[in-house]
Curated annotation (Swiss-Prot):
Its EC number is 2.4.2.10. PROSITE patterns: PUR_PYR_PR_TRANSFER. One of its GO terms (biological process) is 'de novo' UMP biosynthetic process. The gene is pyrE. It comes from the Bacteria. It holds the Pfam family Pribosyltran. Catalyzes the transfer of a ribosyl phosphate group from 5-phosphoribose 1-diphosphate to orotate, leading to the formation of orotidine monophosphate (OMP). 5-phospho-alpha-D-ribose 1-diphosphate binds at E114, D115, V116, V117, T118, T119, G120, G121, S122. Orotate binds at T118, R146. Pathway: Pyrimidine metabolism; UMP biosynthesis via de novo pathway; UMP from orotate: step 1/2. This is Orotate phosphoribosyltransferase. Its cofactor is Mg(2+). It comes from Caldanaerobacter subterraneus subsp. tengcongensis (strain DSM 15242 / JCM 11007 / NBRC 100824 / MB4).
Length: 190
């Protein structure tokens, strides 16, 4: 999908928000991407998931997993496109875990998906979880890569769109210095 088409859909669905945001990574930004707006529409969920699944065509995948909350619907839809199981990892006591009877068997080939990647923190936690259970991570996929090319997961990393959006450490944030109120829209520590 062309970047212009993605941005057109994002604009239509009001995915891109402007302000002063605390991201789940702990960084600050003037832009927040609310991909949940995509997933409220099954047709858009299917379009983006099919696009992401297509990027991993030719890989043998047994399971698709995503971190809660942003990766739940994406993992399910990508898995549906591929025809495999879908799981999600949840944070419990600040650690990513499989719950609800979910399991990964030793040797299963796993694709990790997330709606937006900035620092890759949640994805790295899910990768560690999968490996600790004996699974083999074969790739990482995301709708939006806003990492500015600064992440290496050690496996193929694919995105539907790359966006260059500035992020700041709290101490260096110009929005804080201007006294603009900070909003925390993400799902970390729900």
């Amino acid at each position: 999908m062309e970047k212009e088409k993605v941005l057109e859909i994002f604009e239509k669905l009001e995915v891109i928000n402007k302000g002063h945001f605390l991201l789940s990574s702990g960084k600050h930004s003037d832009t927040y991407l609310q991909c949940a707006k995509i997933f409220q529409y099954p047709n858009y969920s299917e379009i983006f998931s099919r696009e992401l699944a297509e990027k991993f065509k030719g890989y043998r995948i047994d399971v698709v997993i995503g971190p809660a909350i942003g990766g739940i619907i994406l993992a399910y839809e990508v898995a549906r496109q591929i025809g495999v199981r879908a799981l999600f990892a949840e944070r419990e006591d600040n650690v990513m875990k499989l719950r609800r009877g979910f399991e990964i068997s030793k040797g299963e080939r796993v694709l990790v998906v997330e709606d937006v990647v900035t620092t890759g923190g949640s994805v790295k936690e899910v990768i560690e979880l999968v490996r600790s259970l004996g699974g083999e991570v074969i790739g990482v996929g995301t709708i939006v890569d806003r990492s500015d090319g600064k992440i290496d997961f050690g496996v193929p990393f694919e995105s539907i769109v790359k966006l260059q959006i500035k992020t700041y450490e709290k101490e260096e944030c110009p929005l804080c210095k201007e006294g603009i109120p900070l909003v925390k829209p993400g799902s970390r520590k729900l």
